[in-house]
Every structure is written in C-alpha cells, then in structure tokens.
Amino acid sequence: MPRLVAYLLANDKKMIELEVNSVASLIEVSRSAFQGFGKTVHWFRGQTSAAWGLVPTVHRDYDQAGEHNLAAHFRLSASTRHTKAPDLSDLSAWMSLMQHFGLPTRLLDWTASPLVALYFALDSEPHTKAAAVWGLVPSRLNAVSAFKAEETFVLSGPEARPLLLAGMSRGPVVEDVLAVVAQDIDLRMTLQQGAFTLHGTSAPLNERPGANGYLAKFIIPQSAREQIKEELWFLGIRRSGLFPDLANLALELTTDQRRTPRRRVV
C-alpha cells in the first residue's frame, strides 16, 4: 500500500493507470485511487480490450445522419413489437430502450459495482489480450461539462435533453459528455446497478482535457484473466445473476457442467 500511495502522489497530473491481478487488488487500488475525491459515488466499466477508448458504438460506426436513421426506424417499428413502447416525444425513455436492446446509441454503460465491471471485462473476446476496468467519478465529469455542476444528472432532465435532441431529432451538435442515471426499465438494469455516460462527441472520453480529474484505468493482464474469472465465480458474480432470463440461466448451467463435468444437478 505505501508504494501505491507514493505512485499516486508522484503521478497526480496524469490519469491513473494501474495493473490488477485479482479481485482483491482491484478493490484495493480503486479505493486508493479514488481516495482523494472524498466520499462520492464511483462508477466502473469493463472492456475486453485495454486498448479500447471510451467511445459509444454509434460514434465509432456511424455519422450523425446514420445515428438519426437508426433511432427513427427503431421508434417507428417498436410499437408493434414492444407492448410498453414510450410516447414518441419521450426521448430519454427511447434512448434507454434502444440501449437496452442493443441498438448503437450515444450511451456508454457503467455500473456502481467494480465486480460487475470485472465480469464484463472478462466475459467475451478477445481472451488473448489485456482487458481493462475503467473507474469514473461522475460528479467530477459533470463539473467540467457545460453545466459546471458537481452532481450526477438524470437522463430525462434538462441537462441531457440537448444531447438527446442532437442524436434523435436532428438538433444542433453538442460536443459534451455527461454522467447520467436513468429509470430502471427492467430487472437486468437493477441487478447490474447500471448508469451511463451520454456522449455528444466521437472523441474518446479518456482523451478529453482534464480526464485525469475524473477517470482511472485498471489493466488486467492476459495472464490474470482466468484466475479473476474463477474468483468472480466463487463470489457469485455469474451470468444468470446479471441477465435474469431463462436463456442466460441455461447458458450458465451448461458452462458450470463443463467446469465440473461429474457434478449432477438433481
């Protein structure tokens, strides 16, 4: 711990970037890294490649016209496929729904749980590379936004509306990023302790000026992936607990049977 504190003090002008090799080490270094921010909320995001920046899918793969087309077609077609489709004017509800069902949006998923973030960092390909868990202080991000407010915003609130309009209704471009929370639309979002950053720009969040004031990066080397996955399994951080449907329960049970082939579920 003293060596970690010395590192943090020596690098206070740079974004914190530390390697973790176990669940315990992530808890230790993240608590130490965020100590200087006081008793405030922290969010985490797992990414399967440590080389990836913090950019939503829609900004990686689409221009603004493409983003508008995706949103428009989804909203027009959803009412016959989803019995609880929001009113067409409720942009925040539509943005949450699009994100929930996997449409590329200007939202990035975060979680209040570092263990949930670790699960997503290690859950999918590429397994041969280092993964990462990002840490964020949402109130500090919003403090350097256009609103200069050290608090967490609501996706349905006035602060987020200009960014929603830009993505869904051909409003003017707003090159800002906000940390927002939204109403839980199903049990999955509750179990994953979900939150979001809302991006009005394709510039990676980690490359924005002042990112060291609200971001930290914890790198998981390839050599530690399997050990950490075993630790998460032991701690009960499993797929069916984060995706509470029968398809994911079946996938988890199948995986568990492969893990312990002689065990039988009676």
Task: Give the location of each predicted region.
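Catalytic-core elements of nucleic-acid end-processing and repair enzymes
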Residues: 1-266
